[in-house]
Amino acid sequence: LKDAQSRITK
């Protein structure tokens, strides 16, 4: 679930 959160913080 880091991929989804990563794109959100990006």
From Swiss-Prot:
Name of the molecule in the record: Maltose-binding periplasmic protein
Top-level taxon in the UniProt lineage: Bacteria
GO cellular component, one term: periplasmic space
Organism: Klebsiella pneumoniae
Location of this chain's protein in the cell: Periplasm
Entry keyword Secreted: no
Keywords: Periplasm, Sugar transport, Transport
Purpose: Involved in the high-affinity maltose membrane transport system. Initial receptor for the active transport of and chemotaxis toward maltooligosaccharides.
Family to which the UniProt record says this protein belongs: Belongs to the bacterial solute-binding protein 1 family.
Main localisation: periplasm
Entry keyword Repressor: no
